[in-house]
Amino acid sequence: MESIILSIAIFIGVLLGTSVGAGSGSSISPDVDAGSGSRTSPDVDAGSGSRISAGVGTFSGSSTSPDVDAGSGSSTSPDVGAGSGSSISAGVGSRIGTGIGSRIGTGIGTGIGSRISTSIGSRISPDVGTSSGNRISTGVSTGISTTMNARVAVLITAAILSAPVTAIALLEARR
């Protein structure tokens, strides 16, 4: 009977020892290891490595350096290049070249050619022609013919009105 009680006590002791061992070993140590190893160290590494380092790397590399490069390269340099090349060069080339070519060249050519030539040709020649031909000639001829017609009409009217008087005067002269 005592041996049975002793074996039960040893069995209970072994169970308690194993439970405590499993409890300390498995639950506490691995949890701390998992906590420290997995959660703390990798989180710090991930935080420092990925978030801070990579963040600084990304910021410096992508945002700051390329933005400065893009700013200087794309916005400033090409803008200055495009500004100088397109606006100033092309401006000087196009505006002064084309301006002088088109506006002065075409202006003088077309202006003097069309406006002065056409002006002299159209306005002076046809105006003088039209003015002299139609207005002066027609005006003079119409004026003269109208005036002549008016005088003839006055003479005819005077002759008609004076016909009886003339006839009476002729009859009396015969007597």
UniProtKB/Swiss-Prot annotation:
Membrane topology: Multi-pass membrane protein
Biased composition (Polar residues): 59-78
Residues exposed to the Cytoplasmic side: 24-151
Membrane-spanning residues: 3-23, 152-172
Key word Repeat present: yes
Region named Disordered: 26-88
Major localization class: membrane
Subcellular location: Membrane
UniProt keyword list: Membrane, Repeat, Transmembrane, Transmembrane helix
GO cellular component, one term: membrane
Keyword Transmembrane helix found: yes
Side of membrane Extracellular, spans: 1-2, 173-175
Signal peptide segment: none
Protein name: Uncharacterized membrane protein YFL067W
